[in-house]
Design a protein with these regions (language model features):
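Low-complexity or membrane-interfacial segments used for flexible interactions
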Residues: 4-10, 15, 19-88, 94-97, ...
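Tandem-repeat architecture and repeat-register "anchor" residues
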Residues: 78-79, 101-105
Length: 221
């Protein structure tokens, strides 16, 4: 009797999970190195000038991330200090030259992160990006707009003339948090890479905080 009562609930749960997966698939614009550009990217924006791929180390105290090209060569690497209140992160190129630095502002409710591009500009990102159902965010210092699904990092980046700079897509069902960056303006490569790595670290911190909160809640029950 109990099994018969629970069967419809089980079916509804399966339908719900499949629905979420299908919805996430419609937002995903990821493609692996060597694969053709996502057909939606191609139809909407044409062939990108180049594609880059980020991959987070599975077990790393320094939150290491490699950024590789279409031939799987590492072109950038990011690493965070192990003991740092500001979560200081450095991005270096293949010649170990610093490309950008990222720091979190202390005592900020919005978890503001400052990004400095070497030889370029400085700007900030905040956790306001991850508001529920908020699909658009402007980086005031750059005049750029991010539009899409920030909670899973599937978004399009536009400049102040509404031209596409890059399209970022997350790989579904990956333990290493892999992302594809289709670049349409290679002159902004370092800035785009810094934005994606900052958002990756912010998203991971958000997930860890949610897990910690959930664990604490369960322990108190």
């Amino acid at each position: 009797m109990y099994i018969e009562m629970m069967y419809p609930v089980f079916i509804m749960m399966v339908i719900f999970i499949v629905g979420i997966f299908v919805f996430a698939t419609t937002l995903q614009r990821y493609h692996s190195a060597g694969e053709k550009t996502d057909i939606r990217n191609y139809n909407d924006y044409g062939e990108p000038a180049k594609s880059l791929y980020t991959s987070r180390y599975l077990f790393s105290f320094h939150k290491d991330i490699d950024v590789t090209d279409e031939n799987d060569n590492v072109v950038y690497h990011s690493s965070s200090k192990l003991f740092s209140f500001t979560n200081e992160t450095t991005i270096t190129d293949v010649q170990d030259r610093v490309v950008a630095t990222i720091e979190r502002k202390l005592f900020s409710l919005h978890l503001i992160h400052y990004i400095d591009i070497v030889g370029g500009t400085s700007f900030e990102l905040s956790k306001d990006l991850f508001r529920f159902l908020d699909m658009k965010f402007t980086i005031d210092e750059l005049g750029w707009t991010l539009q899409g699904d920030f909670t899973n990092l599937n978004f399009v980046l536009y400049n102040n003339q509404e031209r596409v700079i890059a399209v970022v897509g997350q790989k579904l069902l990956s333990m290493r948090d892999k992302y594809c960056i289709d670049l349409y303006d290679v002159n902004e490569e370092a800035t785009v890479v810094a934005i994606v790595i900052t958002l990756e670290n912010m998203l991971m911190a958000r997930r860890n905080a949610n897990r910690s909160s959930s664990h604490t809640h369960n322990s108190n029950m």
